[in-house]
Amino acid sequence: MSGWQRIYYKLLNLPLRVLVKSKSIPAEPAQELGLDTSRPVMYVLPYNSKADLLTLRAQCLAHDLPDPLEPLEIDGALLPRYVFIHGGPRVFTYYTPKEESIKLFHDYLDLHRNHPDLDVQMVPVSVMFGRSPGREKGEVNPPLRMLNGIQKFFAVSWLGRDSFVRFSPSVSLRRMADEHGTDKIIAQKLARVARMHFARQRLAAVGPRLPARQDLFNKLLASKAIARAVEDEARSKKISHEKAQQNAIALMEEIAANFSYEMIRLTDRILGFTWNRLYQGINVHNAERVRQLAHDGHEIVYVPCHRSHMDYLLLSYVLYHQGLVPPHIAAGINLNFWPAGPIFRRLGAFFIRRTFKGNKLYSTVFREYLGELFSRGYSVEYFVEGGRSRTGRLLDPKTGTLSMTIQAMLRGGTRPITLVPIYIGYEHVMEVGTYAKELRGATKEKESLPQMVRGLSKLRNLGQGYVNFGEPLPLMTYLNHHVPEWREAIDPIEAIRPSWLTPTVNNIAADLMVRINNAGAANAMNLCCTALLASRQRSLTREQLTQQLECYLALLRNVPYSPDATTPSASASELIDHALQMNKFEVEKDTIGDIIILPREQAVLMTYYRNNIAHMLVIPSLLAALVTQHRQLSRTEVLRHVETLYPFLKAELFLRWEKAELAGVVDALIAEMLRQELIVVDGEVMSLNPSHSRSLQLLAAGARETLQRYAITFWLLSANPSINRSSLEKESRTVAQRLSVLHGINAPEFFDKAVFSTLVLTLRDEGYISDTGDAEPEETLKVYRMLADLITSDVRLTIESVTQDDA
């Protein structure tokens, strides 16, 4: 680089350092994309822009990547480390410099022909200032066009703080040269593929143009399905066609989002400021798989679990900072109050009622609107649980919106729809106190401005947040495999409900819940809560708590729940220090050391966090319970117990394994428990290790309440085999409530209606009861005896005394 060029770049860099604050995507490009900085690296940019080049340089230097302004020296030849695919427009359009990208690609490929050991890593890089998609009418060009110098100056001045540098996975020029050759035609193909790559990347980052709201309504009104529904509305309610059409427009106004890029930018600033003060960090995992889906042109439907109202904002914020378009979000109509409703609407929320029953016009308008979002290529987000979990466990899925998603596919759309399950975890959920009150019978408070202000005023240190993207579920692939004839039901006008739709939707929903749990995140808060709630006094010395966390961490690291699940890299001691900063626990000091206490009033609230990872530890807890209670038993007996109880655990906690996989899982966990010296193994026989009995007992306590709940239902069923399902659920809950009072069980989900409903349905599915309610007394009594051996004698006596009291 000449001296004049250095001076030019230094002068240009002065205003950029002030105006531009860009973000790298991914956050650690070398690590996440597997770049080997010991090998040559070159950068490919979409078009000639010195501002883009210097913005890229700043990020490269910040992440220890090679400086793009430093040329590559290969065998005495100096080549630029960057290539612009397109020369880009200029102020004077008649002057366009000669495009050099093809020549540079050819030079690089030619060097690979002459040097067999050479392997240059070609890294495509997009630098974006602002991401407004523009409107379908009004603007001639979208804002992300190739800008000339003056346009670029204004873009950088106005949008420099809303910019990012997107690094794509590298391409090996050695592989290109070996597989495709090194002549000029290959260089031209390389440039053409790069252009397509950048065009797709721009679309993934900004999304399609936004429609004028009224134009969208007019298009929906013109659809045959809504026109027919309007006619039915006029006829059934005996009103004029115009009045029925006005009703349809009013419903569109109620439902439709009013997406605004400026509102996204403003909210991003506010949230960035807020997150930095409330959260100690937002941990994001597996975002690259979603970026790849967007790049490949998939219609993405985000399906997160629902913990808090914060989910709406957090997920959009995370996606925006991953270089993706914030989705259109299905939000409950209860959030459509001033001022939250209009703000959420501009952030992409469209509102959905709790029920569609009895309102054909509403269901038709909503279905057509959702279908229109898909056909235009907007990403969509909805909570398949239907509402926020009050217990910290996943709720049974509500399948209405998922069913409409598949019906949208049956319109014959060409873009593949892919469902992306997402696990959202927090170390503090702001509504957790309200949830506990509602579970105890308090009426749910209606969302309103005063309630929102009260909630915001209580926000303090929220610890860490977690957003883990699970394994995507491509709908077309799923239907091709499970319903090969699905294309026969395609109808571009009618909302088709073929016979296979309901069972298929139910199976997909259950699969999604499993995939959400597969992406679970263990953290300091849920691990500490699990350990302290396992102690009957809700207190442990610091040494005991450290030892127990080490046990959990070793289990989760050495026998991971799933490939997508995450476990903290910090030590047990560091996690305890972090959890204590959250001010949920009390510490008593004496001459021996610290005692960490979970106060009684906090215990119920902390079950929420324990339940977030209950599925990740329930099988190790069951194994620990078997060894603790039996003291000694064979592997065969252990597996028999696990296989008997697993269907109920799987249904309740959306566990990932099939029955055939259990033997391998159990063997791996036994090996880990042996490594930790929690148990002793002599041939086929496992027994308790007395020197580590406390850790094993605390681990076993994770399954204690679940086993007690199962024991209640199996005892009632064996005592009264002809009891109907409804009565069995009701009586099980009554006994559970009594048990919680008599034995100090502080978990609200212990007598949760939904938990017993799932249990009774699983009893039917597993053949313990029939549809008429008649039970198999021998089988139920056998399972009850198995469960009775795993619970304490006082709890067992309380359960068995119920039927005696009734007698």
UniProtKB/Swiss-Prot annotation:
<feature type="short sequence motif" description="HXXXXD motif">
    <location>
        <begin position="305"/>
        <end position="310"/>
    </location>
</feature>
<keyword id="KW-0443">Lipid metabolism</keyword>
<keyword id="KW-0594">Phospholipid biosynthesis</keyword>
<dbReference type="GO" id="GO:0006631">
    <property type="term" value="P:fatty acid metabolic process"/>
</dbReference>
<dbReference type="InterPro" id="IPR022284">
    <property type="entry name" value="GPAT/DHAPAT"/>
</dbReference>
<protein>
    <recommendedName>
        <fullName>Glycerol-3-phosphate acyltransferase</fullName>
        <ecNumber>2.3.1.15</ecNumber>
    </recommendedName>
</protein>
<keyword id="KW-0808">Transferase</keyword>
<keyword id="KW-0012">Acyltransferase</keyword>
<dbReference type="Pfam" id="PF19277">
    <property type="entry name" value="GPAT_C"/>
</dbReference>
<keyword id="KW-0472">Membrane</keyword>
<keyword id="KW-0997">Cell inner membrane</keyword>
<dbReference type="GO" id="GO:0005886">
    <property type="term" value="C:plasma membrane"/>
</dbReference>
<keyword id="KW-1003">Cell membrane</keyword>
<dbReference type="InterPro" id="IPR041728">
    <property type="entry name" value="GPAT/DHAPAT_LPLAT"/>
</dbReference>
<dbReference type="InterPro" id="IPR045520">
    <property type="entry name" value="GPAT/DHAPAT_C"/>
</dbReference>
<dbReference type="Pfam" id="PF01553">
    <property type="entry name" value="Acyltransferase"/>
</dbReference>
<comment type="similarity">
    <text>Belongs to the GPAT/DAPAT family.</text>
</comment>
<keyword id="KW-1208">Phospholipid metabolism</keyword>
<keyword id="KW-0444">Lipid biosynthesis</keyword>
<dbReference type="InterPro" id="IPR002123">
    <property type="entry name" value="Plipid/glycerol_acylTrfase"/>
</dbReference>
<dbReference type="GO" id="GO:0016024">
    <property type="term" value="P:CDP-diacylglycerol biosynthetic process"/>
</dbReference>
<dbReference type="GO" id="GO:0004366">
    <property type="term" value="F:glycerol-3-phosphate O-acyltransferase activity"/>
</dbReference>
<comment type="pathway">
    <text>Phospholipid metabolism; CDP-diacylglycerol biosynthesis; CDP-diacylglycerol from sn-glycerol 3-phosphate: step 1/3.</text>
</comment>
<dbReference type="InterPro" id="IPR028354">
    <property type="entry name" value="GPAT_PlsB"/>
</dbReference>
